[in-house]
Every structure is written in structure tokens, then in C-alpha cells.
């Protein structure tokens, strides 16, 4: 099994020979530890730094740098909102974001993982939705670097006061999104 352990920057991958590709949907590109089958049929394992989304076009390598694999975003069922009225598209994005929906925003369209309830909301706002198969590359969150999708909640500093509540949170409910804020934990 090939152990893919490192991400390559664009500069690092320039001039390297591509071994094969790895096509994954978004639900698997958010994982850092994963057994996969490369597009050429070889078995591989991802052993990457936690909390970073794999983006289409990004290259991975093994410890020796001998194997270079390019990630491809798989086509998956998505809802795409195309709109020439940028104010309407902005309003739709606002309402989707208000529901903590991972959202891909591009010039003239927005895309999210298909959900008929969200589709009905978009139509109710005056938009139109096309359900299609397409790669899904959501925006990195405001508290995340553009390189990844996870978050870290470091809380090592002294507040100068005490609390009778915990500053920890659980990732047990994958449907909940946690956003760390100083002294509070807001969950959806």
C-alpha cells in the first residue's frame, strides 16, 4: 500500500512526474486518515495533517517524495443556482450561509450538496436550481485557512478569571458545526 503523507505546494509539484490521480467526493476529501483506491487501481492510505480539505488539483506524495498523486474532485449530486441578478444571488448565498451550508461560490453561480429542502428555499427566494453532477469545491470557512476546512480550538492562555463551564466541544455529531469564539462555543 502506498502511504501518502505530504501535500505538495504548486511550486513543489512543478516538474515532478505524476504517478496517477485520486478522485474523491467532498465527504472523503475532508478526511485525513483514509484507505483509498487510486484511479490506476493501486491501494493507498492517506496519512495527512488533520483539518485540511483536499482540493481538486492538489498533489500528494509519500515520505520519500517518489510518488506524486493529483487529487481530483469527483462529480457528485449538487444543486447549482445560476443567476444574472447578483443581488438575488447574494441574498440566496446569505440565506444558505445562515444555515451553515458548505457553499461553492463562483462568478454567476453558487453550488451546494443537493438537498431538496434547500432547493425549495432557493426557489421561494426567487432563484432557480438545477440538480446536476459536478465537482464540489466549497469555500473555506471564515475561521479556516484557504488550504483547509477544519478548525483548531487552542485555549492555552489565561483569562484572568475562572469559569464553571468547559471550553471543549465534541465532534461526535457530524451534522453540527462548531465555531469557536472567545469564551463561547456557538453550534448550529
Curated annotation (Swiss-Prot):
It is found in: Cytoplasm. GO terms for molecular function: nickel cation binding; unfolded protein binding. InterPro entries: UreE, UreE_C_dom, UreE_N, UreE_N_sf. GO terms for cellular component: cytoplasm. CDD domains: UreE (cd00571). Keywords: Chaperone, Cytoplasm, Nickel. One of its GO terms (biological process) is protein-containing complex assembly. Residues 142-174 are annotated as: Disordered. Its main location: cytoplasm. It comes from the Bacteria. Pfam families: UreE_C (PF05194), UreE_N (PF02814). Residues 157-172 have a biased composition (Basic and acidic residues). Involved in urease metallocenter assembly. Binds nickel. Probably functions as a nickel donor during metallocenter assembly. Belongs to the UreE family. This is Urease accessory protein UreE.
